[in-house]
Amino acid sequence: MRTFVVLLLASVAFCFAQAAPQSDTLLIKKRNPLKNASFMFSAGNKSPDMPVGVWRNAGNKTSTGTIVWFHGGMTSNNCQKGLVAGGSLANMLPDYTVVSASACKQNHWVEPTTIEAVDDALDSLAKRQKKDIEEISLIGISDGSLGVITYSLWGKRKIKNRILMSTYGESLGPAAQVAAQTPLKNGRWRFIQGGADRLYPSEKAVPWIQEFCQNVGTQCDLKFDPQGEHDWSYWQNKHKDWILEIFSK
């Protein structure tokens, strides 16, 4: 079963395309008193060309935890989405460090080297702050939710919470077969889906989510809004509580 899903993911990655140029920079954005300030540091030579935005408390205040944000539009030509994509989430969860990676073109979320680059960036951040990052939470919107699933399969860190918004998991394979993978059977899963999603109709997306939750063998739930739209702005404005309650426990 595991071999089947790994091969299926590999074929999905091939369909999305491949390759990975080299880079060695990671962008850090600090909060007040250095609002909008930024500086660069090495993300490691293994990384694809992935600009990464990081929002964290200035000074010595301890972060409550680290959240990785996976943006949507993972095959677009904009290869710097991560530099801004995590900003609104950071405002919503100011006590957390938010790491916002960038995917584009052939370096999308279903490409193993892109997931390796996320861990490489986290390694670099941990080195800079002189504190290991052993456990993280993951949040994805649209096809960024596929990044939540693939990091759960391929990433090297323990995962506490996952939120997947406006997703279509069927593109990774049948729900029961995806859910059967051992790395997915820990931590918490929350799916947030809308009945007015312009890209992923609920009659197709919701049954996959329900079957996944039934088979994954760990805490998993679905929050559904019949009027819910596809974009992050809708969930941010209408159902902020569905996101915040995951991080209040």
Question: What is the predicted function of each stretch?
Answer:
Residues 109-130:
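Alpha/beta-hydrolase active-site loop
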Residues 190-192, 198-249:
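C-terminal catalytic histidine-bearing segment of alpha/beta-hydrolase fold enzymes
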Residues 17-65, 143, 208-209, 220, ...:
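A domain-start/cap signature at the N-terminus of enzymes
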Residues 79-98:
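Short amphipathic alpha-helix adjacent to the substrate-entry channel of hydrolases
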Residues 96-116:
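Cap/lid segment of the alpha/beta-hydrolase catalytic domain
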Residues 63-73:
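Short beta-strand element of the alpha/beta-hydrolase
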Residues 128, 134-183:
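Primarily recognizes the serine-hydrolase "nucleophile elbow" in alpha/beta-hydrolase
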